[in-house]
């Protein structure tokens, strides 16, 4: 028997004796017998993974510390969208480093997500107040992709009858790179200048531009309005605290990065981007929107609003493929604004602007030409032939400035900049400090008040802020409280040792465009990770750039697109997708310029191979790709997977392997060996990056050798086709996955996969006598998840799947995935991290709920007044003086007989009114004046 280091045993939930008991319940003598039954022999990897031997937590931390110690952290004045920040310790400790915040899932179940939904609501309010636009979403992935998404909104607004996009000023180079990538498959024409014609869907106005200059865009904005083109502002949110809101000068949309609201640079990410729009555009914007509704008793409650726009419902017709966004970072930004309040934010912005103004005045006095007259934080200087030399001198002094070209440098100030920095930087240009007034755009300063809502004025002391964040966290159910058995979501342990390095100075405080010789730690860490992921998946190359699983899908499909184009087969545009696929699949295919053809599934859940063959042959001249999730979205290892791949290859297509269920494969089988050409890996599922309540995620792609040349590039690396603003995407959280793999080793990773499969099969076994298990493979086995058919309760007692999901809250659980991939069912994925005790607790709850439904069916409880129909039950409702229900208070909140009251979770609201929330959309808090 393999002996594992302590970390492996701490990561995996079931003890040895638990494993034996679970196998015995399944009637199996060993784990190998289970794996032989569940996983087709034709795909098994019959050797150990070639990975470094596992290290202990202490040794892994020491090794990573040595590696990241190769990074040289210097003070950055590079700017270009990334800024030094002071993360308030009260936010770092109580939010960023708090598992109550970072282990939560996307808040689909609103009753157990009120804390983070409330803070995201404040984020939307913050953005709406800064921009003057009424509707904001609860974050996008980064500024560059936010600009691309806003352009997509403009084209949808014009019903795709306009395709020209005018970049009216100088955007950051990485933004232009991402926009160009997005434009090519969608047929957008990207132009620069000031000429607005009748085909112009939108103009994009940087505010300020990449040089730090506020240009005069009055005429081009007026022309856009006259021609019916939308105006998109790319606006710095710190500058907006002292600058006029974009809506006031004609913007229909505003986007930008919230990074400088307390979130470290992290060598490129993760950071939350914002998008705000006029009311007319509300229903066509991407991303999550948090709305305010009421619960069953009329209390205010938050929820995700207008979800019919999104990929999990609209599929290839969705507004975007975005699924996981940057909720944790958006919440940090909101907390930063709450902590400082409007006066504090303006003080930071005013100081930054004053530093830049004094620097500009000093350079002018020394005869140095600078760009523009109106500035905020950045001064761009002309230094003919001296850019490299000046930057080198700055470097010697521990400061990094931006080399724009051989004759031009940029210097950007932020909240960490000091008087000493100002003096030292001026001296590089032979300049001495002189007086200088802040040089904002005349007439464009913010005149009106903002953030008058009470929440932005009530938490000035650390005691108040600490308790505010604690009260919000207490409203939510995250992994620090209980199992989150969401199918297809892999809510496994995010170990403390994996998380610790994210806060290290050598990880958090590097600019993504720092000189290569100063980021050798990142170079080594990412190189290790790429090699390990190649070995785990069998691919020849990996890109770590995609900063979400959806972006990994997009990057992989774009690699396929560029491969076909390079071979003179750019006409290949048909993407075959099973009817059971994740909604991001068709949405990503559409964004990559492909037309979706749906492949049918058989009644047993498997892909209909005859239908696949017929459609592949029908479209053989234009077949680009086939997207498949494996194990299937039904939680089964399909025996025909290799045959599926052969059919696609025989007809000229490439196989895209959706890695959402990779947690059932690691160490047992590899996508490339099965026949895949490209696969995205959700590091926030399989490889332990936490979900953060809806992000961050990381979705790197692995590709076969012939696709390596078509991996995403980056303008900083002298290549094209970037899918994210930074070359390594959300680079700082890659250390989490590095730590996980380094502490598990190849044998530990395989053991984790086996445990995940055991846990799922044990659940299926325990529940199959009460609920049908919809799909199973050979030997009646499932993979790492199973679909429980709760429709039997609907048939017998009128109890819906939503009733079951909400009743599980009373038992102390986050509901499994509801009504996907099959309506009216629950999909359960326990992961390897859950102990047998917790798994049994979930099974006991599900069995008890079936018993409660029987009481309804038998007439003991009325169909409209029973613990399931009224779930969840809050403390205030349960303690009310009057109790008119036909069941007891104890049955309401301490159900199941053996329920442990010490583990009780109390939801803050009862069932939320979703329909009413969409009919009466409220997605930001009105200013105080609105109540006058």
From Swiss-Prot:
The glycine cleavage system is composed of four proteins: P, T, L and H. PANTHER family: GLYCINE DEHYDROGENASE (DECARBOXYLATING), MITOCHONDRIAL, GLYCINE DEHYDROGENASE, DECARBOXYLATING. This is Glycine dehydrogenase (decarboxylating). The lineage of its organism: Bacteria, Pseudomonadati, Pseudomonadota, Alphaproteobacteria, Hyphomicrobiales. Its EC number is 1.4.4.2. SUPFAM superfamilies: PLP-dependent transferases. It comes from Brucella melitensis biotype 1 (strain ATCC 23456 / CCUG 17765 / NCTC 10094 / 16M). GO terms for biological process: glycine decarboxylation via glycine cleavage system. Belongs to the GcvP family. The gene is gcvP. The glycine cleavage system catalyzes the degradation of glycine. The P protein binds the alpha-amino group of glycine through its pyridoxal phosphate cofactor; CO(2) is released and the remaining methylamine moiety is then transferred to the lipoamide cofactor of the H protein. Its cofactor is pyridoxal 5'-phosphate. It catalyses: N(6)-[(R)-lipoyl]-L-lysyl-[glycine-cleavage complex H protein] + glycine + H(+) = N(6)-[(R)-S(8)-aminomethyldihydrolipoyl]-L-lysyl-[glycine-cleavage complex H protein] + CO2. InterPro entries: GcvP, GDC-P_C, GDC-P_N, GDC_P, PyrdxlP-dep_Trfase, PyrdxlP-dep_Trfase_major, PyrdxlP-dep_Trfase_small. GO terms for molecular function: glycine binding; glycine dehydrogenase (decarboxylating) activity; pyridoxal phosphate binding. It comes from the Bacteria. The modification N6-(pyridoxal phosphate)lysine is found at residue 685. GO terms for cellular component: cytosol; glycine cleavage complex. The keyword Oxidoreductase applies. Keywords: Oxidoreductase, Pyridoxal phosphate.
């Amino acid at each position: 028997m393999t002996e594992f280091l302590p970390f492996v045993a701490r990561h995996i939930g079931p003890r040895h004796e638990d494993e034996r008991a679970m196998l015995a319940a399944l009637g199996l003598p060993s784990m190998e017998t289970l794996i032989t039954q569940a996983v087709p022999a034709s795909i098994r990897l019959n050797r150990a993974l070639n990975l470094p031997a596992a290290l202990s937590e202490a040794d892994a931390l020491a090794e990573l510390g040595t590696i990241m110690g190769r990074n040289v952290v210097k003070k950055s004045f590079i700017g270009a969208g990334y800024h030094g920040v002071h993360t308030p310790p009260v936010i770092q400790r109580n939010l960023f480093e708090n598992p109550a915040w970072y282990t939560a899932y996307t808040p689909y179940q609103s009753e157990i997500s009120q804390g983070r939904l409330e803070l995201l609501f404040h984020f939307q309010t913050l953005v709406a107040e800064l921009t003057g636009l009424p509707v904001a979403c609860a974050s996008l992935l980064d500024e560059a992709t936010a600009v691309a998404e806003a352009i997509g909104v403009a084209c949808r607004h014009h019903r795709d009858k306009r395709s020209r996009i005018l970049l009216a000023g100088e955007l950051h180079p990485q933004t232009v790179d991402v926009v160009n990538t997005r434009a090519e498959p969608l047929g957008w024409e990207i132009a620069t200048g000031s000429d607005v014609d009748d085909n112009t869907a939108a103009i994009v106005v940087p505010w300020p531009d990449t040089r730090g200059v506020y240009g005069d865009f009055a005429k081009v904005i007026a022309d856009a309005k006259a021609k019916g083109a939308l105006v998109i502002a790319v606006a710095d949110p710190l500058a907006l605290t002292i600058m006029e809101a974009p809506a006031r000068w004609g913007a229909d949309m505003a986007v930008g990065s919230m990074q400088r609201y307390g979130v470290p640079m992290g060598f490129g990410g993760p950071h939350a981007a914002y998008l705000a729009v006029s009311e007319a555009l509300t229903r066509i914007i991407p991303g999550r929107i948090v709305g305010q509704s009421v619960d069953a008793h009329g209390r205010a409650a938050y929820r995700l609003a207008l979800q019919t726009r999104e990929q999990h419902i609209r599929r290839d017709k969705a507004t975007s493929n975005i699924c996981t966004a940057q909720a944790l970072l958006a919440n940090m930004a909101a907390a930063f604004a709450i902590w400082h309040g409007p006066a504090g934010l303006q003080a930071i912005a005013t100081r930054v602007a004053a530093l830049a103004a004094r620097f500009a005045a000093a350079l002018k006095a020394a005869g140095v030409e600078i760009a523009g007259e109106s500035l905020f934080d950045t001064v761009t200087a002309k230094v003919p032939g001296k850019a490299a030399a000046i930057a080198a001198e700055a470097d010697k002094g521990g400061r990094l400035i931006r080399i724009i070209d051989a004759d031009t440098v940029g210097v950007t100030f932020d909240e960490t900049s000091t008087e000493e920095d100002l003096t030292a930087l001026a001296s590089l240009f032979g300049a001495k400090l002189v007086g200088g007034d802040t040089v904002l755009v005349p007439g464009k300063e913010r005149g009106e008040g903002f953030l008058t809502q009470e929440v932005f004025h009530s938490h000035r002391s650390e005691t108040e802020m600490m308790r505010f964040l604690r009260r919000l966290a207490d409203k939510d159910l995250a992994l620090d409280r209980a199992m989150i058995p969401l199918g297809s979501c892999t809510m496994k342990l995010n170990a403390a040792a994996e998380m610790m390095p994210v806060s290290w100075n050598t990880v958090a405080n590097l600019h993504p465009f720092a000189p290569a010789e100063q980021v050798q730690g990142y170079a080594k860490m990412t190189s290790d990770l790429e090699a390990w992921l190649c070995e785990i998946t069998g691919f020849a190359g990996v890109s770590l750039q995609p900063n979400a699983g959806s972006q990994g899908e997009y990057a992989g499909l774009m690699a396929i697109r560029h491969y076909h184009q390079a071979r003179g087969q750019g006409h290949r545009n048909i993407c075959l997708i099973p009817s059971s696929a994740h909604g991001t699949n068709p949405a990503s295919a559409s964004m990559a310029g492909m037309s979706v053809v749906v492949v049918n599934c058989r009644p047993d859940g498997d892909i209909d191979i005859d239908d696949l063959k017929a459609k592949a042959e029908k479209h053989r001249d234009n077949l680009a790709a086939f997207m498949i999730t494996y194990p299937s979205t039904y939680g089964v290892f399909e025996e025909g997977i290799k045959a599926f791949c052969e059919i696609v290859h025989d007809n000229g297509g490439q196989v895209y392997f959706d890695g959402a269920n990779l947690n059932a494969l690691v160490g047992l089988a590899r996508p490339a060996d099965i026949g895949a050409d490209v696969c995205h890996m959700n590091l926030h599922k399989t490889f332990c990056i936490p979900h953060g309540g809806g992000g961050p995620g990381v979705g790197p792609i692995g590709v076969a050798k012939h696709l390596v040349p078509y991996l995403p590039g980056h303008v900083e690396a002298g290549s094209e086709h970037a899918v994210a603003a930074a070359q390594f995407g959300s680079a700082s959280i890659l250390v989490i996955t590095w730590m996980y793999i380094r502490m598990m080793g190849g044998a530990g990773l395989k053991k984790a996969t086996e445990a995940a499969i055991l846990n799922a099969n044990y659940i299926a076994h325990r529940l199959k006598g009460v609920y049908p298990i919809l799909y199973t493979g050979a030997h009646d086995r499932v993979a790492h998840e199973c679909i429980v058919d709760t429709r039997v309760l609907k048939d017998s007692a009128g109890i819906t799947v939503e009733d079951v999901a909400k009743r599980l809250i009373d038992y102390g659980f986050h509901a499994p995935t509801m009504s996907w991939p099959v309506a009216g069912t629950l999909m359960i994925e326990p992961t390897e991290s859950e102990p047998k005790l917790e798994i049994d607790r979930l099974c006991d709850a599900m069995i008890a709920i079936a018993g409660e439904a029987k009481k309804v069916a038998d007439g003991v409880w009325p169909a409209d007044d029973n613990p399931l129909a009224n779930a969840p039950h809050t403390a205030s409702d349960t303690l009310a003086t009057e109790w008119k229900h036909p069941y007891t208070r104890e049955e309401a909140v301490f159900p199941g007989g053996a329920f442990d009251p010490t583990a009780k979770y109390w939801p803050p609201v009862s069932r939320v009114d979703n329909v009413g929330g969409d009919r009466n959309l409220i997605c930001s808090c009105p200013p105080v004046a609105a109540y006058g």
